[in-house]
UniProtKB/Swiss-Prot annotation:
PROSITE patterns: RIBOSOMAL_S16. Pfam families: Ribosomal_S16. It comes from the Bacteria. Gene3D superfamilies: 3.30.1320.10. GO terms for molecular function: structural constituent of ribosome. The keyword Ribonucleoprotein applies. InterPro entries: Ribosomal_bS16, Ribosomal_bS16_CS, Ribosomal_bS16_dom_sf. One of its GO terms (biological process) is translation. The keyword S-adenosyl-L-methionine does not apply. One of its GO terms (cellular component) is small ribosomal subunit. This is Small ribosomal subunit protein bS16. Belongs to the bacterial ribosomal protein bS16 family.
Length: 97
């Protein structure tokens, strides 16, 4: 199974994470298939960047985001975009019924 998860970078007591696509059997910091962005929790406020189009493409191919990765992707609207592509946009008429 392919997962979207965080891989730890940085030095001791200064974590920095890359958001990557990886085979679930690989180690946390092992080789990854594709890099989607980064997350720096040390800065105030936390700095994040995600390639939305790549993330949507991988999720539609079947990649499963971990809980933390899903939370970060949701902040960029990736999960909403995937939902709209899979199930269609909700129109105002459907919302009123």
């Amino acid at each position: 199974m392919v997962k979207i998860r965080l891989t730890r970078m940085g030095r001791r007591n200064r974590p920095f994470y890359r958001i990557v696509v990886v085979d679930s059997r690989k180690r946390r910091d092992g080789a990854y298939i594709d890099s989607l962005g980064f997350y720096d929790p040390v800065k105030d406020p936390a700095v994040m960047s995600v390639d939305v189009e790549k993330a949507v493409e991988w999720i539609l191919k079947g990649a499963q985001p971990t809980d933390t990765a899903r939370s970060i992707l949701s902040k960029f609207g990736v999960m909403k975009k995937v939902h709209e592509i899979k199930y269609g946009k909700k129109t105002e008429e459907e919302g009123n019924e």
